[in-house]
């Protein structure tokens, strides 16, 4: 299969101020939602590879032993460490990563963090599953994309990446949580 057979899906739950983490770099309780978590876990189970930042990897042990690609400036390029693959994007191009890890194509799940979301926006998402916890404002912390730190909305970044939104779906009415899937 060609590189076009690689299907990249991003996943994030964000606050009304487009944040994915608090000022300590952690996902706050206000962004944890059982309906979103169940959907997210199902999507990770469908993936052939999960691309995650080093901090996310350290904070979320790979208990289900999913095939994981950890993005880190500390990697030599593309290397295997235990059951995970580690990748330094500046040292090894994405096409080499996919040739090695997904030679027959497949689905890549991207759960973040910010630098990882930014990188895959450049590589090209097929879809981005954007969950929003309405009524939640963090006020400080990490935003979804670097451009959001400069005032852009998450939606404008996704639109600029060539994605278009489907109709929002309420996944938890009591908590006022919606999911919008943006697709190419």
Report each predicted region and the residues it spans.
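Enzymes that bind and transform nitrogen-containing heteroaromatic metabolites
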Residues: 1-184
């Amino acid at each position: 299969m060609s590189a076009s057979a690689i299907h990249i899906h991003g996943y994030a739950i964000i606050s009304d101020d487009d944040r994915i983490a608090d000022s300590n770099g952690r996902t706050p309780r206000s962004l944890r939602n059982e309906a979103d978590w169940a959907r997210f876990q199902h999507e990770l189970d469908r993936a052939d590879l999960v691309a995650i930042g080093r901090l996310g990897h350290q904070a979320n042990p790979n208990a289900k032993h999913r095939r994981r690609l950890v993005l880190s400036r500390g990697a030599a390029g593309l290397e295997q460490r235990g059951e995970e693959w580690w990748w330094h994007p500046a040292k090894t191009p994405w096409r080499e990563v996919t040739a090695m890890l997904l030679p027959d194509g497949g689905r890549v799940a991207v759960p973040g963090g910010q630098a990882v979301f930014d990188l895959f926006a450049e590589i090209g998402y097929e879809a981005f599953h954007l969950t929003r916890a309405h009524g939640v404002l963090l006020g400080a912390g990490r935003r979804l994309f670097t451009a959001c730190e400069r005032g852009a909305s998450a939606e404008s970044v996704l639109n600029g990446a060539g994605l278009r939104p489907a109709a929002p779906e309420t996944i938890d009415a009591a908590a006022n949580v919606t999911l919008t899937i943006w697709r190419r």
